[in-house]
Amino acid sequence: CIRDSYLATAGRAVARELLVYRYNQLDKAIENAAKLGFRDGAALYPMVTVNGEECHNEWEITFEEIHRNGAVAYAIFNYIRYTGDTAYLADCGLEVLLSVARFWAQRITWSGARRKYVMLGVTGPNEYENNVDNNWYTSYIACWSMRYAAESAAWVRENRPADYARICAKRRFDETAETKRWLEIADGMYFLSLIHISE
């Protein structure tokens, strides 16, 4: 979403505006997810858009290249890490992170056979294999996003309590219940290894 080189050369204000753009498209991302059956404020950012709605016409990309949600979350992390602008997290970023984490928590399923959480029917960022199960990158960025959302919620609660209360009311966020679920999924995620690939 925002490259390190761009952060280093374009200036903090420009980089922040790119993330504010993502925040301004959040309600459309929630609508996009709702069209696919997701609920409770889960968001799926579009692969291609002019107004926040998905404009891509290849279903594998639209429905399966969902790692893009992780790129949005990582852009927030990277921007704050690089600039120190923690105000962005309370102003805009946490709402995006909560909605992305809600998407992952609903998209990931439990496998009784593996006794782990799995990610079925995705296309990874290399686009070489479509409609695969347990793409390592997609599973990893999903788990990372849920953990980062939980950490960010705790940070905003402790450091910006008025903003935290506003966000909880606006997004109907129950930190205790939701973050418990996110961390349970992240801790129990199945990841392919060389042993599993050779089986």
Predicted regions span which residues?
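Conserved small/polar residues in nucleotide/adenosyl-binding loops
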Residues: 1-2, 195-199
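Well-ordered alpha-helical scaffold segments within catalytic/enzyme domains
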Residues: 3-13, 60, 71-86, 103, ...
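Helix-terminus loop motifs that line ligand-binding clefts
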Residues: 13-74, 80, 87-91, 100, ...
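Hydrophobic packing residues in well-ordered alpha-helices of helical domains and bundles
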Residues: 15, 93, 179-182
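Alpha-helical scaffold segments in carbohydrate-active enzymes
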Residues: 21-28, 95-107, 144, 148-151, ...
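Catalytic cores of glycan-processing enzymes that make or break glycosidic bonds
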Residues: 50-56, 115-122, 139, 170-182, ...
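Acidic/histidine-rich catalytic neighborhood
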Residues: 103-173
